[in-house]
UniProtKB/Swiss-Prot annotation:
Potent insecticidal toxin with probable ion channel impairing activity. In vivo, reversibly paralyzes all flies within 30 minutes, even at low dose (0.3 nmol/g). This is U21-hexatoxin-Hi1a. One of its GO terms (cellular component) is extracellular region. Its main location: secreted. The keyword Calcium does not apply. InterPro entries: Cys_Knot_tox. The presence of a 'disulfide through disulfide knot' structurally defines this protein as a knottin. GO terms for molecular function: ion channel regulator activity; toxin activity. It is found in: Secreted. Belongs to the neurotoxin 21 family. The keyword Secreted applies.
Length: 92
């Protein structure tokens, strides 16, 4: 019983941590470009301070990208993260 409970907790934590990046559009094809400051653009799920730092989707007609404030249980508050989502999605 203890082993099963431990496995369930592990799976739940793994899904919460890994699933968060996928919810932010990590699996959507995007362009990895160099910014004017010489750094690469930030991928979905990375922390950001403004929209220009984030990578843009390959298909910009279907997908929108940017930097938005989201809740982070690990940080214990709100953080700003890059995202890519479908324009037609109600979550975007």
């Amino acid at each position: 019983m203890k082993t099963i409970l431990s496995m369930l907790i592990f799976v739940a934590l793994f899904a919460a941590i890994v699933g968060n990046r996928w919810n932010l559009g990590y699996g959507i094809p995007h362009k990895q470009v160099k910014l004017p400051n010489g750094q690469l653009c930030k991928e979905p799920g990375d922390s950001c301070s403004k929209r220009d730092e984030c990578c843009k989707a390959d298909d910009q007609k279907t997908y929108s990208s940017g930097c938005a404030q989201t809740w982070s249980a690990m940080e214990g508050g709100f953080v700003r993260e890059c995202y890519i989502c479908a324009v037609e999605s109600s979550m975007c």
